A protein has these predicted regions:
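ATP-binding glycine-rich phosphate-binding loop
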Residues: 17-43
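ATP-binding pocket architecture of kinase catalytic cores
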Residues: 45-71, 75-153
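ATP-dependent phospho-/nucleotidyl transfer catalytic cores
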Residues: 25-29, 53-54, 60-65, 119-139, ...
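Active-site beta-strand-loop-beta-strand hairpin of nuclease catalytic cores
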Residues: 39-49, 230-232
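Active-site activation/catalytic loop segments of kinase-like enzymes and analogous catalytic loops
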Residues: 248-262
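Juxta-kinase regulatory segment immediately upstream of eukaryotic protein kinase catalytic domains
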Residues: 1-25, 73, 77
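Conserved active-site aspartate in kinases
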Residues: 238
Length: 262
């Protein structure tokens, strides 16, 4: 997924900027998408920062659907934030549209690109530095689910299905394409011995004992923008994995990340 300077310049011509975009270079330490920082010089002399991303099609097989999901979710969030007297420019992601009105641009190589407005005065943290950080993460993701509680989950394709993930795992172990299963036999046995646990939540959902929600599915601290001045969580980011699921999975994932000492 290497990117050339020519490709980047082509991409910049595809978006409706409020000024002249100037590429600043690679940004952040994400491992899935290629991310770049842009400075947009407006006619009044102001400078706005934006985030340019090349979507990884090896991971996201249907980038158009991903962006449609994000637009639907963020539009809903904006409405709810305004109703609550909040700031929709800082409390949810905002997408810059391409010149054709779409929330993405497809370059001549068939690669998909998107641009987000930069959230100023806020930062992401790679690890929990205090109990308050963990609390702010929980508060932010809880608020995220609350704001989306009346969003129709069934309109989003896909589902976070642990039972299906387990079936995929068993097939991968059996195929052992890279010949590495032997080295982790104990770990594999540990997982296989708990196969029945993989279906518990799905069975509760099917029985109507747990509700289907719109879930984030990657509830890590570094997917929260924390205000630099107040040290409070203000915005949930990385919405690529948003899909119908169970809120308890989001809770468990956040505990896994925050409580780990590894």
């Amino acid at each position: 997924m290497s990117v050339t300077e020519k490709q980047l310049q082509e991409v910049l011509t595809g978006f409706e900027f409020p000024g002249t975009p100037v590429l600043q270079g690679v940004y952040g330490n994400g491992h899935i998408n290629h991310t770049y920082l842009l400075h947009v010089m407006e006619q009044n002399g102001n400078k706005k920062r934006m985030i340019l991303q090349q979507m990884n099609r090896s991971v996201f097989k249907k980038p158009v659907e991903v962006m449609e999901n994000i637009m639907g979710v963020t539009s809903h969030l904006r409405r709810k934030i305004v109703e609550n007297g909040g700031d929709p420019e800082r409390e949810t992601l905002n997408v810059l549209l391409a010149k054709d009105g779409k929330p993405y641009y497809v370059d001549s190589c068939g690669e998909y690109w998107r641009i987000y407005h930069f959230i100023e005065g806020a930062s992401c943290y790679e690890q929990v530095e205090s109990e308050e950080d963990f609390y702010q993460s929980a508060l932010s993701f809880g608020n995220f689910q609350c704001l989306l509680s009346d969003y129709p989950a069934e309109t989003i394709p896909g589902f976070h299905d642990t039972k299906q993930r387990f079936a995929n795992f068993k097939r991968a172990v059996e195929a052992d394409v890279m010949g590495r299963a032997k080295a982790v036999e104990r770990e594999i046995e540990f997982v296989l011995a708990r196969e029945q646990d993989a279906a518990v939540l799905g069975n509760l959902l099917a029985a109507g004992e747990l509700p289907l929600r719109v879930t984030h599915n990657d509830t890590k601290l570094n997917n929260i923008m924390i205000d630099d001045a107040t040290r409070q969580g203000i915005c949930v980011i990385d919405l690529d994995t948003v899909m119908p699921g169970l809120s308890v999975n989001d809770f468990g994932d956040s505990i896994r990340f925050g409580a780990s000492t590894a």
